[in-house]
Structure formats: C-alpha cells, structure tokens
C-alpha cells in the first residue's frame, strides 16, 4: 500500500470526514463547485474528451461527466482512490503522471492538487501538459509557497 493509499483511505473514512460526509460525494454540489473553480459553464464540456490526471476518488471526473464530456479518462496513483472513482468511471486506472507519454488528444485536462505532491513538479507539469491538444485547455491547481489557508470548497 502506498502513502497515497493510506492517505485516501483515511481521508474518505467516516472518522476523518465527520460532518463533511459529502466532501467526496458525486452530487450537483460537486458540479457547481467544479464550475466555480474552473470557469466552465453548463455546456462547456459538451462532446469533449477530458483527462482527470490524479483523479483521487473521482469527484471532478463526475463533474466533467455531468457537464457533457463525451469521455473522461481518469487515473490516480492510489488504488484506494481508484476503487471509489470506478463507481462512476469503470475505466479509471491506477497509474502515475510520470508514465504519461506525449499524447495531445484531450480537449480539457485537469490536475487538481496533484502536481506539487510529486518528486519533480516541473516534470509532472510537462507530462500533464503533453496531453492537451492544440486549442485545448489545461487546468491545474497547486499550492503556493505560503500555503497557509484552508481551501474554500475543498
């Protein structure tokens, strides 16, 4: 079991979540949060091919599906997180960002809160960016150097 398996097992557990049981749910609340965070509107992903790089339990995969994505490929290094993601995306895979080969076929690529957890953030960014097709969109979130606040809506 990897460190991330342990983390996701803990984070998705009843004891950790307490009153925040909906933190990783698949609901309209997640869709609205995704729209707010990305600026994507209700029809913004219609017919698009998307990638959720470092998908965790799949809350953003779900949002992309609900916003009309034709296909969402999802992967994460944690087998624990992938178990949950497969509830909404049976094709979700366990894998590392560092295994990505240049493959610019995605209209929209998301990597939320993932890149800075890798041994080489710049290389991780390059690997993820290599998946975006011409005129596609790459949306990432990384902590800044002074990250000292709780993320509102996370």
Question: PLM features: residue spans?
Answer:
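A short glycine-rich, Lys/Arg-flanked "PGG" loop and its adjoining helix->strand segment in the class I
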Residues: 122-134
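A conserved beta-strand element that flanks and buttresses the S-adenosyl-L-methionine
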Residues: 110
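Conserved class I S-adenosyl-L-methionine
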Residues: 1-44, 48-54, 137-154
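Class I SAM-dependent methyltransferase SAM/SAH-binding core
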Residues: 57-98
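Short conserved loop adjoining the S-adenosyl-L-methionine
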Residues: 99-104
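Short catalytic micro-motifs in class I SAM-dependent methyltransferases
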Residues: 113-114
